[in-house]
Amino acid sequence: MKTRIIYLCLLVIFSTTGCIPTQTIKGDGNITTENIPVSEYDCLELEGGGMVVNYTQSDVPEGLEIKTDRNIFEKYEFNVEDHKLKIRPKKEFRKHTNFRPTEFMVTANSRNLKKLAAAGSTHVNINSPLQAEEFEAGLAGSGIIQFHDTASFTNLKIEIAGSGDFVGHKVYCEELNGDMAGSNTIVLGGTVGIAEFSIAGSGTVRAFDCTMDELECKIAGSGDIEASVVNKIKAEIAGSGSVKYKGDPQDIQKKVMGSGKIEKVE
């Protein structure tokens, strides 16, 4: 847990506060819409500010449409490398540059998606049902990843560093792993077999609408977890964090150091 949390903290430092912008590039208001040919991809890597991404999983050929200011568009690159669609500033603008587009709309689709990583203030909407054996969602900064439809996985991994949010009201998976560093939020609904969460800081998990067979969690700081649990809870708290649960799990293992608490709620 400690190694992963340290990694997450470093990730958000270098992607946000660690590189203090020395120039701000504002959108010129000359909005352009560009359709960019892309090859097959199953991973999205996004970097930038003010970007709104609308993604759809579909059987039609991969597509990418960009709508933004002309001067912003010219300073970004859009390409597929090793099945990864990368949308990010060109190399000379990746450090010490703050982008303020008038608008920055990305519309993308692919047959498969197994990884999504966003750095900055990107807002990603998954607008279709999403299916995958393994899926990884990563946020560094103040971005949002939101599933607007059913999401079904065997294994789901969520990593958030900073103040970002992950929202999925219809998530169905056998195993879920969430690592959180900072003051972020995970909102879940649906059904999960085994859920594991590690929180460093003031992160929050809102999952009363998600039925979990087992919950295992470690909280360092003032993090909070709300969940509906059927069979087992194993919780470790160091600090003032809390675990609130609904349900009647018969196996409850807890270790608390500090003022943290684990309690059942109606």
What are these regions (language model features)?
Residues M1-E266:
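Intrinsically disordered, low-complexity terminal regions
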